[in-house]
């Protein structure tokens, strides 16, 4: 552990944020507890991440989680890779499909659209960024500009998280660690520096405050206004 996280008792102003996070992920990430040392930073991050990751958009939620995994894997952040793969499973992506991510170019588990998105995420995670006109042209065969913009927002958010968690060697929580050990070790995943036995998040799961329940209810029912597009037949698009 490189920086001691804030305790939830000393971050009461984020009770609603933590409750929403628990409802979505099943736990409060140690990365957020470390971020809570700077309340203004966590407040801004929580709002942005809810907008990009939780709010329903025009991309399939499972595909979002898969590209989160791929950009994290490409950037070398094992913490975020474990989180993203675990989130994909929570969003009903089959575990055998997650296990096939290391061979997504050849695997029959993935559609051509998914391969294009994963290829794009893989290139975006490299330093320097390896996204070129070829990757964009391939994306446009399957996604419209608004869907691509949503995808880039996800990748940009993960760029911040990859560097945050890799630089801090954030200890990986039990849930995503167990999932990664079961399903990602075959494609090269290792906990490495994120394996810390100090219980940073020992708090029992708390009941969700009414305000947080209302926020989640609104998020799950919000849909952007549909726009006429030749891509509206794609499963990730809003009907």
Language-model segments: residues:
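Hydrophobic alpha-helical segments
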Residues: 1-239
């Amino acid at each position: 552990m490189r920086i001691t996280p804030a305790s939830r008792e000393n971050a009461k102003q984020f009770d609603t944020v933590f409750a929403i996070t628990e409802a979505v992920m099943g736990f409060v990430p140690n990365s957020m507890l470390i971020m809570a040392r700077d309340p203004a930073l966590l407040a801004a991050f929580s709002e942005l991440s809810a907008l990009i990751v939780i709010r329903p958009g025009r991309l399939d939620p499972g595909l979002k989680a898969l590209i989160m995994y791929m950009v994290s894997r490409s950037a070398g952040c094992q913490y975020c890779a474990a989180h993203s793969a675990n989130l994909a499973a929570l969003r009903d992506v089959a575990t055998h499909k997650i296990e096939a991510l290391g061979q997504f170019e050849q695997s029959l588990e993935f559609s051509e659209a998914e391969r294009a998105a994963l290829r794009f995420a893989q290139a975006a995670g490299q330093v320097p960024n390896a996204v070129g006109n070829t990757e964009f042209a391939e994306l446009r065969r399957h996604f419209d500009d608004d869907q691509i913009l949503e995808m880039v927002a996800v990748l940009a958010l993960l760029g911040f998280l990859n560097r945050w968690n890799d630089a801090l060697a954030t200890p990986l929580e039990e849930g995503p660690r167990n999932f990664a050990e079961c399903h990602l070790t075959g494609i090269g995943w290792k906990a490495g520096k994120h394996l810390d036995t100090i219980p940073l998040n020992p708090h029992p799961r708390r009941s969700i405050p009414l305000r947080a329940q209302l926020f989640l209810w609104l998020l799950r029912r919000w849909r952007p206004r549909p726009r006429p597009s030749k891509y509206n037949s794609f499963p990730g698009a809003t009907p």
